Design a protein with these regions (language model features):
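Domain-level signature for soluble enzymes in the chorismate/prephenate branch of the shikimate pathway
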Residues: 1-228
Length: 228
């Protein structure tokens, strides 16, 4: 049988494989970047001009390097576990949402389902030290299904979406219209427990004047995430 024969050597591919291994080792030894927005800008530069297939591979490699070099990763919910495995590998530790948030307070990062029955994201209004700094999937055409929560947050990267919560009893359509009149593009993401979550186009700071008369008595920005 042909499979009993030793496969031919390919010195060129072997050299490329060794170069990849050496580059990954060197990158891990260098440690994580000091800021999440710096990491996002670097990844975006690497993805510039990449083909769709290349983009998936580069994001997966980048995510695994970040997971290995950065804080421990917690996952909460089935979708979060799937998305975390795709981006960061299988090292995420599963916990309920509230326990995941407590782990973030102690220095971890947590990827938490948006589809949770309880609006854990609303609790971030009362816990400003915790911030959404990423959302997966993170391409502009996809709706976020899970949020990466950290203590550090993310600054503007030039292509972002911001997450805003309100307790307004208005319909989502009416809220979107009101936000549009204020100069903000809002997209409803979730509603539970009397709270509504919206994605705002761009990087919107908590003190942005356009939010001054936003609908609702209890409102606030709970983070922002880059788009690739």
């Amino acid at each position: 049988m042909a499979f009993l024969n030793e496969p031919p050597a390919d010195a060129a591919l072997d050299a490329l494989d060794r170069a990849v291994v050496e580059a990954v080792r060197a990158r891990l030894a260098a440690g994580p970047r000091t800021r999440l927005d710096a990491s996002a800008l670097s990844l975006r530069a690497l993805l510039a001009g990449a083909q769709p297939g290349d983009t998936k591979v580069l994001k997966a490699l980048w995510g695994r390097i970040e997971a290995a070099a950065g804080p421990s990763l917690i996952t909460s919910g089935g979708l979060a576990q799937v998305l975390a495995a795709d981006r960061y590998g299988l090292g995420g530790r599963p916990l309920p949402a509230e326990e995941a948030l407590k782990a973030v307070e102690e220095g971890a990062r947590a990827l938490i389902d948006l589809s949770s029955d309880r609006p854990w994201w609303g609790r971030l209004l009362a816990r400003p030290e915790l911030k959404i700094a990423g959302a997966l999937p993170d391409d502009a055409r996809a709706r976020p299904q899970a949020f990466l929560v950290t203590r550090e947050g993310s600054g503007p990267t030039g292509e972002d979406r911001t997450f805003w919560v309100t307790d307004s009893g208005w319909s989502e359509t009416k809220i979107v219209e009101a936000m549009g009149e204020a100069g903000l593009v809002a997209d409803p993401l979730a509603a539970a427990g009397g709270l509504k979550l919206f994605a705002l186009a761009g990087y919107v700071q908590a003190e942005d004047g356009r939010l001054t008369n936003a609908p609702g008595r209890l409102t606030g920005v709970i983070g922002a995430a880059p788009i690739f």
